């Protein structure tokens, strides 16, 4: 069974910096402002010769349970319960505070092994804080600097001593099976063979995106059947993208909760800019993006811009009309919403849109059925023979226009990518091919090969002319 380590402590002591150091990637947002981390984040780590799962947590604060800070503390308590070992982090520069004393008592009650980590120990100013740390009653402090990578060998030894060698090394696995290295912003898979088989054993990467306060985290909690993510009436509760593994009808799913995207003109603070960057990274890494609309106020300008962003990134967009439990005259409203989808989002004909209620768990199976269906289409490979028989038919029915008195010729088509489907068309004078004709071909491909709701990429190439460059006789 995998070793799980939780990083806990009061706000702004460097927990997320240590988390990033352990996983070897800048996954967690880091800022000088306290309280950046809110949800608990779990990731596989390789720390020297140790392999384990590490949990980043929100800073522990004194607050009532019903407040945002109180709900954040509840998430941290869950992480403590899930962990085999606790890294209790303090700021050696600022010394011990009353909050450190109170929360040290909290983690002691868990009866879990604890390693006391005196972070920010790179300067002489931290010397007194390291000595003060003994007063917490958590044993000898391990002095490190997560930012500068100092003292990490001592931390490794402290972890092994705390859990024992058997537990520390029991779950050691090959690096390539523990550390997942996927290319963020993948532009698709090049096709070299005719028959690309759809792999149902591979996980589907799904990002949940949308404006702030549309119910994204509530929807994921409902999908999981547990309060995994922090939710609340406050807008902008989620700050960074959280990855969660899930299984639906025996299909492995990797979910990404993301921070709400506001209009660019409203984004002023550095922290929100970091959150937006993290959300965009999650969208590019995902395969399917569920854009959550508030059914009581759908199709705001920002909703449409987010869908357009997903399409431009080549990901599969699916609209989730959330808070459907608040809607009356459901059938009439749904028909109107589908009509608006077709009118306001013509970039992808046949865009999937599903009404649901994240709060009550209604419509989730319908959403997932649409996701698995359209994900298969996104991976579809069409043979060159079928494509060219189709091309001959549509060009005969509607030939390309004449430009400057010379008719354009479309000669050949082949699929060069999946994820999203990408096609190369050989034609004369591609630089003057009208966008209207390309839309005609793109929509024709969707209709003929049953690819509704999926972005399609068309690229044009000049057909080779064997006489170009030949010497005149």
Swiss-Prot record:
Associates with the 50S ribosomal subunit. Belongs to the TRAFAC class TrmE-Era-EngA-EngB-Septin-like GTPase superfamily. EngA (Der) GTPase family. PROSITE patterns: G_ENGA. It comes from Bartonella bacilliformis (strain ATCC 35685 / KC583 / Herrer 020/F12,63). GO terms for molecular function: GTP binding. One of its GO terms (biological process) is ribosome biogenesis. The keyword Mitochondrion does not apply. The keyword Repeat applies. GTP 1 binds at residues 9-16, 56-60, 119-122. Residues 3-167, 204-379 form the EngA-type G domain. Keywords: GTP-binding, Nucleotide-binding, Repeat, Ribosome biogenesis. GTPase that plays an essential role in the late steps of ribosome biogenesis. Residues 380-464 form the KH-like domain. This is GTPase Der. GTP 2 binds at residues 210-217, 257-261, 322-325.
